[in-house]
Swiss-Prot record:
Family classification: Belongs to the diacylglycerol acyltransferase family.
Function summary: Involved in glycerolipid synthesis and lipid metabolism. Catalyzes the formation of diacylglycerol, the precursor of triacylglycerol, by transferring the acyl chain of a fatty acyl-CoA to a monoacylglycerol, mainly at the sn-1 or sn-3 positions. It uses both sn-2-monoacylglycerol (2-acylglycerol) and sn-1-monoacylglycerol (1-acyl-sn-glycerol) equally well as substrates, and uses sn-3-monoacylglycerol (3-acyl-sn-glycerol) with lower efficiency. Probably not involved in absorption of dietary fat in the small intestine.
Glycosylation site list: 125, 180
Sequence intervals crossing the membrane: 24-44, 104-124
Enzyme kind, highest EC tier: transferase
Keyword Lipid biosynthesis set for record: yes
Topological relation to the membrane, as annotated: Multi-pass membrane protein
InterPro entries from the UniProt entry: DAGAT
Keyword Lipid biosynthesis recorded: yes
Name listed for the protein in its UniProt record: 2-acylglycerol O-acyltransferase 1
GO CC aspect terms: endoplasmic reticulum membrane
Organism: Bos taurus
Length: 335
């Protein structure tokens, strides 16, 4: 295979964009382990005056990811996020005005390999979120285990993510007067194993917990589809029933997160590596589904609203797929 190297005369801005994406990628693939290693090092070599105050503070701060987190506008305004957004680039599209007197659940689809669109749009101040949705604060919910790693949790929370636990979602949606948006990647870890280019398989049929929470809090549901999310990486073929898929699913059940074997391009060449491809991401926010607060919803009410949500999600995909190069015969597959 002939290696295609990047030309030397690439503009500085594009180099900075690649560096920004590399920083983000390494943050999620390696930084947690580095932070854990730092704590272990401090304990082994008895730097008690460093680790003891932090671990004491950590004990009292443990619930913060379930209580709205601790975002930093300074971190969200870092210039590196502008280069990160422009690398793909990432776009946020609004199709309907939202009433800031309500709280909302944005159901984000698809998961993709690393949920790039969700981070770029809802965890930095360089997306069009503030202009499109004035009066709102968004909270991207991520797996709780990210917040169990000392030091890394502080870095992660500074961009705005909070835990995806029920307690955390309920906390966000309990704001009096509205104006909060819980962004939940509903397909979760399982869906990442089906994040192949040109494929649109969503794990949604058994995901009904978010519907019950929406009913109990009267939070409006909004389907969100991120066109281009599955085009950023290629995965090793892992069809249902294959030995690789079986291993991945078993590991996912044990660890709580999936391990897709993905690849894309490198820093200085285009043939192999872990840097995502430069593919545009268009995150389209659909029409809100009004939800009447029901403190003790029945299974029938949950099922009915869940069905309505899936219909609105499919409608959103069908209405916009042609704008983003998806063939007319392609459709969503709900699992």
């Amino acid at each position: 295979m002939k290696v295609e190297f990047a030309p030397l005369n690439i503009p500085l801005a594009r180099r900075l964009q690649t560096a920004a994406v590399l920083h983000w990628l390494l943050s999620f693939l390696l930084f947690a382990q580095v932070c854990l290693g730092i704590i272990v090092f401090l304990i082994i070599y008895n730097y008690w005056f460093l680790y003891l105050p932090y671990l004491t503070w950590l004990y009292f701060d443990w619930q913060t990811p379930e209580q709205g987190g601790r975002r930093s506008e300074w971190v969200r305004n870092w210039a590196i996020w502008r280069y990160f957004k422009d690398y793909f680039p990432i776009h946020l599209i609004k199709t309907w005005d939202l009433d800031p007197s309500h709280n909302y659940i944005f159901g984000f689809h698809p998961h993709g390999v690393l949920v790039v669109g969700a981070f770029g749009n809802f965890c930095t101040n360089y997306s069009a979120f503030k202009e499109l949705f004035p009066g709102f604060t968004s909270y991207l919910h991520v797996l709780p285990y990210w917040f169990r790693c000392p030091l890394f949790r502080e870095y992660l929370m500074s961009s705005g993510p909070v835990s995806v636990s029920k307690k955390s979602v309920c906390h966000v949606l309990s704001k009096e007067g509205g104006g909060n948006i819980s962004v939940i990647v509903l397909g979760g870890a399982e869906e990442s194993l089906d994040a192949h280019p040109g494929k649109f398989t969503l794990f949604i049929r058994q995901r009904k917990g978010f519907v019950k929470i929406a009913l109990t809090h009267g939070a409006y549901l909004v389907p969100v589809f991120s066109f281009g999310e599955n085009e950023l990486f290629k995965q090793v073929s892992n069809p249902e029933g294959s030995w690789l898929r079986n291993v991945q699913e078993k590991l996912q059940k044990i660890m709580g997160f999936a391990l897709p074997l993905f690849h894309a391009r490198g820093i200085f060449q285009y043939n192999f590596g872990l840097i995502p491809y430069r593919k545009p991401i268009h995150t389209v926010v659909g029409r809100p589904i009004p939800v009447r607060q029901t403190l003790n919803p029945t299974s029938e009410q949950i099922e009915e609203l869940h069905q309505t949500y899936m219909e609105e999600l499919r409608k959103l995909f069908e209405e916009h797929k042609g704008k983003y190069g998806i063939p007319e015969n392609e459709t969503l597959i709900f699992r």
